[in-house]
């Protein structure tokens, strides 16, 4: 509906969107009951040594109605209605079991963790329990958080991440460069890896944007952290990584 002084005009588009989200919320509950979620592992590639160096776990909804929509849409809805906790627990259990299979190759798998999960009472303990239950070795699992995550409650986030790192988890800082934190955060967060956001990768071949990304890499390396450049989709972008000393890349060029 749109309001214009003396009358209200019905807007079918808005109503359809409301109905769509309501239906999706109902289907999310059924999806958990019917085991419709599955995990997909996107490789993080070592462009210098030409090998797979790690994987990021990504959730997919095996339902004809939602198979082609971005996971971000239903994950955001799950965060709002509280289902993210149950979905997150499924992800942890599935990924930790798979991580055991990759251990002999020295390859870590990362899981994306939302603020709702990390701030949930007992979540860190749950991660530690599953880690122990699957008899995983230190370095087998990486917890991935976004840069904007740090704005929620910085000191609490750092405390929880330190606990995880001290118990053998790797820490990945995702979407770096898209938030409002200063470069000093690189020295405060206990991260092993910083992931440069795709929005920067898209522009490395435009004007002097590549030089900016190169300088960003120098700051990150100065903080003693590894770098994964996200959104690598072309051979030109891969060559940029190699020529500027970026060791790891992730994106559709390596695997869809």
Enumerate the predicted regions with their spans.
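Regulatory and interdomain segments flanking nucleotide-handling catalytic cores
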Residues: 2-5, 21, 48-53, 71-76, ...
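Catalytic core of bacterial c-di-GMP phosphodiesterases, primarily the EAL and HD-GYP domains
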Residues: 7-11, 17, 47-56, 81-157, ...
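Active-site core of bacterial EAL-family cyclic-dinucleotide phosphodiesterase domains
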Residues: 9, 13, 20-77, 112, ...
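EAL-family c-di-GMP phosphodiesterase catalytic domain
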Residues: 47-48, 64-66, 99, 114-121, ...
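Conserved functional hotspot residues or short segments at active or partner-binding sites
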Residues: 160
């Amino acid at each position: 509906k749109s309001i214009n002084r003396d009358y209200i005009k019905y807007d079918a588009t808005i109503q359809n969107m409301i109905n769509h989200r309501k239906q999706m919320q109902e289907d999310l509950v059924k999806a958990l009951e019917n085991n419709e979620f599955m995990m997909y592992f996107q490789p993080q590639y070592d462009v210098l040594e030409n090998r797979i160096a790690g994987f990021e776990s990504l959730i997919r909804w095996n339902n004809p109605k939602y198979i082609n929509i971005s996971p971000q849409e239903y994950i955001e809805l799950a965060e709002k209605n509280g289902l993210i906790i149950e979905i997150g627990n499924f992800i942890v259990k599935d990924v930790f079991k798979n991580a055991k299979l990759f251990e002999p190759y020295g390859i870590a798998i990362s899981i994306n963790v939302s603020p709702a999960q990390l701030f949930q009472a007992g979540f860190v303990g749950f991660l530690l329990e599953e880690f122990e239950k699957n008899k995983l070795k230190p370095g087998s699992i990486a917890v991935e958080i976004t840069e904007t995550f740090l704005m929620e409650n910085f000191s609490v986030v750092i405390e929880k991440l330190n606990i995880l790192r001290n118990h053998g988890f790797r820490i990945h800082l995702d979407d770096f460069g898209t938030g409002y934190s200063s470069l000093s955060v690189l020295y405060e967060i206990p991260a092993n890896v910083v992931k440069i956001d795709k929005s920067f990768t898209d522009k490395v071949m435009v004007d002097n944007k590549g030089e900016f990304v190169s300088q960003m890499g120098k700051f990150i390396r100065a903080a003693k952290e590894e770098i994964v450049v996200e959104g690598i989709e072309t051979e030109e972008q891969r060559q940029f990584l190699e020529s500027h000393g970026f060791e790891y890349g992730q994106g559709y060029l390596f695997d869809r």
